[in-house]
Regions:
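Helix-loop module immediately N-terminal to the HCX5R catalytic loop
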Residues: 49-93
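Hydrophobic/aromatic beta-strand patches that form the interior of the parallel beta-sheet core
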Residues: 25-27, 47-51
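Short catalytic/ligand-binding loop motif for oxyanion handling, primarily in non-cytosolic enzymes
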Residues: 35-36, 59, 101-105
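A general structural motif
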Residues: 21-23, 46, 89-91
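Catalytic cysteine-centered active loop of the rhodanese-like fold, especially the PTP/DSP P-loop
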Residues: 81, 85-114, 118
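Short, conserved loop/helix-junction motifs that constitute active-site signature segments
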Residues: 42-44
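Cys-based phosphatase fold recognition centered on the PTP superfamily
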Residues: 1-40
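Cysteine-dependent PTP/DSP-like catalytic domain, specifically the C-terminal lobe
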Residues: 108, 113-153
């Protein structure tokens, strides 16, 4: 399976252009105060998991000023394991707004959970949000590691 990490805009385009015969699933990650992304229902779209959590790793910035938004919590990733265990597709699109940190964190945890045999396709910088990665690993029942995730551009 290919795990594709991308931005929200690219995910919408990719789902619109699913090739005939290709089976695709999506994990859609938005901030906690945003409306979820709607994907046009296509017969090749196997499923969509909607997750909502902010792209934060700590509560305060370097000067001690609070960000004013809640940190991701374990409950924000509820349903991830059930969704991943049931995957039966050629490609899993994992997106967040920019496609670099929350989606990279989820994709890294999924890659590790599935034994590291999938290909991770990226379109830009790959910088997993560390807190989101730890929470995703916890939801998947695996131990987070510092193992680098091989990516393909």
């Amino acid at each position: 399976m290919i795990i594709e990490v991308c931005s929200q805009n690219r995910a919408l385009k990719e789902v619109t252009n699913i090739q005939t015969g290709e089976l695709v699933s999506v994990i859609s990650i938005v901030s906690s105060d945003e409306k979820g992304v709607e994907f046009d229902c296509k017969e090749n779209l196997c499923g969509v998991l909607h997750l909502k959590f902010n792209d934060l790793e700590k509560e305060y910035d370097e000067e001690g000023i609070p960000y004013g938004r809640p940190l991701p919590k374990s409950k924000d990733l509820n349903g991830l394991k059930e969704f991943v265990v049931q995957l039966d597709c050629d490609r899993l699109i994992v997106h967040c707004y920019e496609g670099t940190s929350r989606s990279a964190a989820a994709a890294s945890a999924i890659w590790k959970f599935r034994g590291g045999s999938d290909t991770i396709l990226t379109h830009q910088r790959f910088a997993p949000n560390r807190l989101a990665y730890i929470l995703a690993c916890k939801e998947l029942g695996i131990t987070p590691g510092n193992q680098p995730v091989p990516t393909v551009r």
